[in-house]
Structure formats: C-alpha cells, structure tokens
C-alpha cells in the first residue's frame, strides 16, 4: 500500500470524498460498491466484486468447458477477467477488460461476433469468433462469461452451455 499524500475530512454523515484522479486511475465508477477493511489504525477500501466469492468455481467451470470444446473460455466481473482457460492465459487473465467489453456487458444481452476484430483488454485486440452472455443477479449485471476461438465457429451447443453457466453464476451470486 502506498501513500497518496491526500488528506480528507469526514463529514457529519461519515462520508469521505475520494479524489477524481484516484477514482479515474483505479477505474472506480459512480455508484460502484466498495469493501471496507479495518486493521488497527488503518481503514482500507477495495473495489467490491460479488464474483470474487465464486472465483474457484468459475475457474473450474471455464476449465471444464475449455477442455471439452477446445476453445478459450473466460469469466469477467465488471472490471477484469477473473477466470480464463485455454490459450493466452498469461496475456488475459487478471487484466482489466476493455471499455468495448464493458459496454457490451452493460447491454445485458448475448453478443455473437463472427470473424471480427475485438478488443478484450485495453490495447490488445484479436480477430476471432466470440460469444458472450451477461451474468445477471437481482436485476443487475455482475459480469459475463465468454467463449472464443480464432479458427473455429461457435456452435449452438456451445452457445447453450455458455447461456446455462451465465444463469447458474447469476443464481449463485443471488444466494
């Protein structure tokens, strides 16, 4: 943890204003949930992702699907890729998603792209076949699950599996 040199007062409602520059650098959006940690004299804030609790099961799900279909499969929260299985894991895993993917997730519908260039993470685009379903819990978008391949098309069977997994993860977040 590093110090920023910024000092803020707490108002009478217990609020602290986080400077715009820090919010911009950490990609914290208005209304985004923050987790509070307390340790002796320290209070720390962390961006909250309800999918963090499901990282282990997410990794197992993407691994199983990827092994079966021989394609890249990944799960995102609203900020980064939290589970990846297939080729190029070192390039994509635990990286922030691009604004393009963020906007597509927020459209709250299936995205099916055939042989087009897409930007998965900032500064890294790829020509591929790509299918994405949003993960929706309690009416809010929490992330997405995607399958992609540079060479093979996405089949109807694969589409149905990805859709079911998106619904399953949404139900898990609700509980």
Kindly give the residue locations of the regions a language model identified.
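A short beta-strand signature within small-molecule sensing/ligand-binding domains used
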Residues: 125-134
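Structured interaction and signal-relay segments at domain junctions
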Residues: 62-124
